[in-house]
């Protein structure tokens, strides 16, 4: 068998063994995709014992390409919501998550100086303790740029593997200790979250309001206070027995019923201006109007603003809602359309069919992947990651690297959505497949490289002390911020658990947090809010530590 064929066969074996290990769960908790690392260590140990020679250049390429695939698909997935997460609604969560990252870096620096831990080893311990694989890749790359020999750099993978198991267990233990210390009732926390979820990340609501303010009689809808901005859409108007789709210039009369769509706080303010909320139905049933959801798939309308479609003037149709990446938004006139957006249309059946044809509404396109934008994004990301950032006094230039460059580029492209006929929408199933393939390839190679000396390091070398250092890096930041967030900020416990899992970019911890209350989405919401920024910081932190420690040594 050729060296290349043998290398591919061994990698496939690692993936099979590792994924099987990851599927083994104890009390509902397992290593998940991290099991591939341990599969690689096991197979790597026996490969080393048997003296089997694998292709080093091929392994290096597979490791780097797997990392690129992983971080790029993450960026495309979270890109549409990343910049929104940095606004005020997610500011507090992101500040606590940033504090966890900073404390982890400080603990790592203290351990490095106190115990004189070799630089590659301490960076590997840091990456494993925070369960962040891209941090491992970024750390290895900066060490190579600093001229550290390859065999020394590979120690990072071994120390990463030593610290990784408690990295996962440490997050779960922190959640349990916070719950125990503050005597938290999870059911009550879920109820409080539901009661307060009207703020910040609220879903859209609808109300029916009777026009009772005499000052609004014979006034155009576009001139009514609270209806003349992009926060509320009036999608139906009922006058007597007649139900119609109103235009911005439609004149309202006293006694008219308006069907309004918006966030609860905006609807409340509009009600104070217009009149009393009524229970009268403004349903389209039994009328010549209907409501339909249509998907934007036509490249010709991508990037256009809703007002530029002129659907009301041309078709007598109103767009009442916009769903983007699972998030319900008000269909404001200034909103730009992206591939995969789902629009709620209200109008006559034949008019809605005409609008749907213009927007595309080709469901099969949602299952197709445009490969050209994928490789454009990866190529631009690699170029971005290769740009050196020279800082006075640093012995080497900082780079975003193969982990940070594609991630940042994917976040930007995911937010932009489309450029001309190119769109960066990726079906969730395709995104997940590429992401899992990438991380499996990366971890398989890291495990293989670490497997040869792993057992000897654990039993005869410094393996146990590395595990102890990892416990400090995991536990101190999590416990400190967990207690502060609950005690001082009075953070909801389920939200806190999601934030802790997100600060470590750890899917198994998120699964555990979600299982604390099966029907509450609090943990998943806070996880998604902090994940993008934390992922970026986790990639940058080992590079900063490497450059600083190298300069001081």
UniProtKB/Swiss-Prot annotation:
UniProtKB keywords: Cell membrane, Membrane, Repeat, Transmembrane, Transmembrane helix, Transport
Gene Ontology biological process: potassium ion transport
Domain RCK C-terminal: start-end pairs: 192-276, 279-361
Q: What membrane topology is annotated for this entry?
A: Multi-pass membrane protein
Per the record, the domain of life is Bacteria
Segments passing through the bilayer: 4-24, 28-48, 65-85, 95-115, 158-178, 371-391, 403-425, 437-457, 464-484, 493-513, 532-552
Q: Does the keyword Transferase apply?
A: no
Recorded GO CC terms? plasma membrane
UniProt cross-references to InterPro entries, sorted A to Z: AAE_transporter, RCK_C, RCK_C_sf, Transpt_YidE_put, YidE_YbjL
Name the Gene3D superfamilies for this protein.
Answer: Regulator of K+ conductance, C-terminal domain
State where it is primarily located.
membrane
Where is this protein localized, as stated in its record? Cell membrane
PROSITE patterns for the chain = RCK_C
Q: Name one GO molecular function term.
A: monoatomic cation transmembrane transporter activity
Question: Does the entry feature the keyword Transport, yes or no?
Answer: yes
Q: Which family does it belong to?
A: Belongs to the AAE transporter (TC 2.A.81) family. YidE subfamily.
Designated name of the protein: Putative transport protein KPN78578_40470
Organism of origin: Klebsiella pneumoniae subsp. pneumoniae (strain ATCC 700721 / MGH 78578)
